[in-house]
Amino acid sequence: MKTLTLKKEIIKIFQKYGLSKDHASISANALINAELVGAYGHGLSRLKMYCDRISKKVINPKPKIKTKKISQSISHIDANNSIGFVAADLGIKAAIKHAQKTGIGMVAIKNSGHYGLSGYYAEQAVKKNLITMIYTNAPPAVAPHGALKSLFGTNPVCFGTPTGSKIPFILDTSISVINRGKIRVAARNNQKIPEGVALDKSG
């Protein structure tokens, strides 16, 4: 399926679940980007998850997002439980605008959710010749050494910087040995995962 055709189909699905066309388009772009860069655990495999969260009212399809400008360099966004892609899109755009004006841009977002690849947003800033750092929290998924129960989030971190060439440096990772997206893909495709990256009831 061609990328444009796929995007149209994803937009239709999101609109069916109540997203505006603009928010559906932003979300579709992020999902397709994940597929194109090979991060399948953050691509189309997540589409059902987002739709389910809308149905369960975890995600607000019609959010009233509020942006508060703290200073010339800092903004705070209350995303009103919007789909994460929309909140992240607003956040990186605001950070870029601040940085271009004052040399640094900082944006904090609350009341949002899973937004896919941090690298997708870092790349947008790097294309504007900006160094970027993105941090987010996550629910418990990582067990401390010797434990069987999750305590820490994967808490993804992302760094991006121009390199002077067409290929920027972008590191999008988490504090866990493997991201949950890869575990999800392996489970769905009945594939084995490397030893030592996950725990069951026996350790």
What are these regions (language model features)?
Residues 1-6, 59-62, 196-203:
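Histone-fold modules and their flanking histone-like tails across chromatin and transcription assemblies
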Residues 1-17:
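Generic N-terminal amphipathic, Lys/Arg-enriched alpha-helix
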Residues 21-32:
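Short, well-structured alpha-helical segments
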Residues 22, 36-47:
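N-terminal amphipathic, basic helical "cap/leader" segment at the start of enzyme domains
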Residues 43-96:
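Active-site cofactor/substrate anionic-group-binding motifs, chiefly glycine-
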Residues 75-164:
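A generic, well-ordered mixed alpha/beta core segment in the N-terminal half of proteins
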Residues 142-203:
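Phosphate/diphosphate-binding glycine-rich loops and adjacent basic-rich segments that engage nucleotide
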